[in-house]
């Protein structure tokens, strides 16, 4: 449970960095508290999407992973970010990713920042 909480906090931080760096990834809302709560909920959705959907997509696209020497991971991460944006829209959350290439850059940013944060945050075993 602690591990899931740590990963959710890391994902929320990574998503915040992506929102900050890319104009086409938007997080609208009133106060800072509302935006923080929205980021945490979006991070939960992102974590669930990565936990449930991503392994299935990785198995189905395994030949493309082999052919591209792993670069197809960027496309899969972009699709997971777009799916998170779609789910957030259905849940009336004010998080939106505008376009595939923005999602590719956003997925790259989220992956790097999340990796860095997870390296420094406690494991929570």
UniProtKB/Swiss-Prot annotation:
It is found in: Cell membrane. One of its GO terms (cellular component) is plasma membrane. InterPro entries: Phage_holin_4_2. Keywords: Cell membrane, Membrane, Transmembrane, Transmembrane helix. The keyword DNA repair does not apply. It holds the Pfam family Phage_holin_4_2. The chain crosses the membrane at residues 9-29, 33-53, 56-76, 100-120. It comes from the Bacteria. It is a multi-pass membrane protein. PANTHER family: SLR0284 PROTEIN. This is Uncharacterized protein SCO3922.
């Amino acid at each position: 449970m602690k591990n899931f909480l740590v990963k959710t906090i890391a994902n929320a931080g990574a998503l915040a960095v992506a929102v900050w760096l890319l104009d086409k990834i938007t997080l609208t809302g009133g106060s800072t508290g509302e935006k923080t709560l929205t980021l945490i909920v979006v991070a939960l959705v992102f974590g669930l999407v990565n936990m449930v959907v991503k392994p299935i997509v990785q198995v189905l696209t395994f030949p493309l992973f082999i052919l591209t020497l792993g670069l197809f991971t960027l496309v899969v991460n972009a699709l997971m970010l777009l799916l998170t944006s779609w789910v957030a829209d259905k849940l009336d959350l004010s998080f939106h990713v505008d376009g595939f290439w923005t999602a590719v850059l956003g997925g790259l940013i989220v992956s790097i920042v999340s990796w860095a944060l997870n390296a420094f945050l406690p494991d929570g075993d």
